[in-house]
Regions:
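Conserved SAM/SAH cofactor-binding pocket of Class I
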Residues: 1-74
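Residue-level signal for inorganic ion chemistry
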Residues: 20, 63, 79, 101, ...
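Helix-to-beta-strand junctions that scaffold the AdoMet/dcAdoMet cofactor pocket
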Residues: 29, 83, 108-111
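C-terminal beta-strand of the catalytic ATP-binding
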Residues: 66, 155-158
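Mobile active-site "lid"/loop adjacent to the S-adenosyl-L-methionine
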Residues: 66-96
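Conserved Class I SAM-dependent methyltransferase catalytic core
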Residues: 92-156
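Flexible, glycine-/basic-rich loop-and-beta segments that form/coincide
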Residues: 158-164
Length: 164
């Protein structure tokens, strides 16, 4: 639908990247989708290019691990045994990765760019507060088809808004 769009996929899991590479090939996106193994923004790719204007994205979309550590044992077996713990464990309160990503996202978003998260159904207010605390505006929680909070969206301030 967006034939000029370019993307960079980042995951810490080698297995997840293998699946992403298969999907990229199947969809014919090899020239438009770059895939990087990294723990968030720690890869050399981001460190070497952190001042590079070409690394300013229009949007960052993340589905980070968001289940509190103590709740992982309570998950349905289909989830608990299908997904690796690495993909589920959001640490103590389930918000660890939202904090880490949000505090760094501004360095990689263009002014007016969007940060979007998938969230646990009870995390909308907390993730919204994290984003607002880092200066994101127009923060909105979107519901899924079941009527549960599922996505939080926020906008990086425009340059002139940041200096007011």
């Amino acid at each position: 639908e967006l034939p000029q769009a370019l993307g960079t996929g980042v995951d810490v899991s080698e297995g997840a990247l293998c699946v992403a590479k298969e999907n990229r090939k199947r969809l014919g996106l090899e020239q438009r989708a770059e895939l990087i193994q990294s723990d968030l923004f720690s890869a050399d790719y981001f460190q070497k290019n952190s001042g590079n204007i070409s690394l300013e994205y229009d949007m960052l979309i993340s589905n980070p691990p968001y289940i509190p550590t103590e709740d992982i044992g309570k998950l349905m077996e289909e989830v608990r045994f299908h997904d690796p713990v690495l993909a589920l464990d959001g640490r103590e309160d389930g918000l660890y990765f939202y904090r880490r990503i949000t505090e760094q996202a501004g360095k990689y978003l263009k002014p007016g760019g969007w940060l979007m998260y998938e969230i646990g159904c009870e995390q909308g207010a907390d993730v919204s507060a994290i984003m607002q605390g880092e200066g994101f505006t127009e923060v909105t929680v979107k519901k899924d088809l079941a009527g549960l909070d599922r996505v939080v969206i926020g906008k990086k301030q425009m340059q002139e808004e940041q200096h007011v």
